[in-house]
């Protein structure tokens, strides 16, 4: 994608994500470059995983062409999922989500990985 086409593609992805969340209180925001953050207040890892599945299903059904991709002919997303816990900072939460995203990409992309901040849970 060129710059304008890339921005249009990202806007479509954002629209798919916004349609995929649970409530109007859920937040979808671009987080620089090609990354987004989705904040799901008062949700569990399993609820967040359901939203991730819905995002992937809705994006697959939208079938936006991505000819330059080695992963898929259409636009896909990889996602990292985590929870906030007492005493967390925004930086810490983002770092955990980023680690989960990295793991998703290492496992082949077009998938999500959840990273539980609570050991043994």
What residues fall within each predicted segment?
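Short helix/loop segment flanking the catalytic signature motif in cyclic-nucleotide metabolism enzymes
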Residues: 9, 37-58, 93
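Short aromatic/hydrophobic contact patches that present stacked aromatics
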Residues: 37, 78-81
């Amino acid at each position: 994608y060129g710059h304008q086409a890339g921005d249009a593609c990202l806007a479509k992805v954002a629209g798919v994500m916004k349609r995929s969340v649970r409530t109007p209180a859920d937040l979808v925001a671009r987080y620089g470059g090609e990354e987004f953050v989705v904040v799901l207040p008062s949700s569990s890892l399993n609820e967040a995983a359901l939203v991730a599945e819905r995002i992937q299903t809705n994006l697959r059904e939208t079938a936006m062409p991505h000819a330059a991709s080695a992963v898929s002919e259409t636009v896909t997303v990889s996602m990292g999922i985590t929870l906030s816990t007492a005493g967390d900072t925004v930086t810490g939460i983002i770092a955990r989500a980023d680690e989960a995203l990295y793991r998703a990409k290492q496992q082949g992309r077009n998938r999500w990985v959840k990273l539980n901040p609570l050991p043994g849970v």
